[in-house]
Amino acid sequence: MKRRQILGAALLVPLHGLAQTCGVITPRQTEGPFFSPNSPLRASLLEGGEKSRLILSGVVLTPDCKPVPNALLDFWHSDEQGAYDNRGFRYRGHQHADAQGRYRLETIVPAEYPGRTRHIHVKVQAPRGRILTTQVYFPGDPGNKRDGLYLPELEMKQAKAGEGVFDFVVNV
């Protein structure tokens, strides 16, 4: 194959699949003290009036780059002031990946709070698989350097303003 053909073929690779390297299981991170079970089934956590909207999307994959259909993703994060809703389900929800392992979450950009940079918690589970609990971080956030839990490999890739991409790699 000629160099030009290889470069041209590389341009055909979708953005999903570039966000996380297959073969490497997404690193586990702490659940933290604010997880609440039984979140509502919903792909949008928006409740109206929010200013810093975010669309986070990606694919749930196996280590050999196969999509994980119907994977369960449970998301939660702080609000615009860095507080978690511990009585209800504001900025909490779960969804299932589609037949190609894709997910799409509409939410806000959460605030940082003392000791923590901006992040989104997530539990990912393949059907009948183990739960992977982790966190997704924002690229270039100044708080990343101060956060002892931050891992650069858990940064979402910025697709464009207000959109991020992160692919999860899980064992099935």
Which ranges hold each PLM region?
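N-terminal secretory signal peptides and thylakoid transit peptides that target proteins
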Residues: M1-V13
